[in-house]
Structures are given as structure tokens and as C-alpha cells.
């Protein structure tokens, strides 16, 4: 899980979702998981 000021899709499987007021990226590639901090 990367915590970033700016979350971006890193590949075509990444999806940007909003969960509990936080922007997150979920993906089939575990290294692509991100949340906005």
C-alpha cells in the first residue's frame, strides 16, 4: 500500500474508488495499491 498525495492509475487493471472519504486505487497487482494521504 502506497500513501500518496496524488493517486494515479498505474495500469489498465487499476480502479479508483472512494471509500470512507479516502481515494483509493485497487488493482490485481498488489504493488499498485494506493491511498491518498
Swiss-Prot record:
Q: Could you give a single Gene Ontology term from the biological process aspect?
A: translation
In terms of Pfam families, this protein maps to: Ribosomal_L36
Q: Which UniProt keywords apply?
A: Ribonucleoprotein, Ribosomal protein
Q: At the top level of its lineage, which domain of life is listed? A: Bacteria
Check the record and name the InterPro entries matching this protein. Ribosomal_bL36, Ribosomal_bL36_sp
Q: Which HAMAP family match?
A: Ribosomal_bL36 (MF_00251)
**NCBIfam families, per this entry?**
rpmJ_bact (TIGR01022)
Q: Which family does it belong to?
A: Belongs to the bacterial ribosomal protein bL36 family.
Name this protein carries in UniProt:
Large ribosomal subunit protein bL36
Q: Which organism is it from?
A: Chromohalobacter salexigens (strain ATCC BAA-138 / DSM 3043 / CIP 106854 / NCIMB 13768 / 1H11)
Amino acid at each position: 500500500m502506497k500513501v500518496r498525495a496524488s493517486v494515479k492509475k498505474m495500469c489498465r487493471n487499476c480502479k479508483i474508488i472512494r471509500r470512507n472519504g479516502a481515494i483509493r486505487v485497487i488493482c490485481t497487482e498488489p504493488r499498485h495499491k494506493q491511498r491518498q494521504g
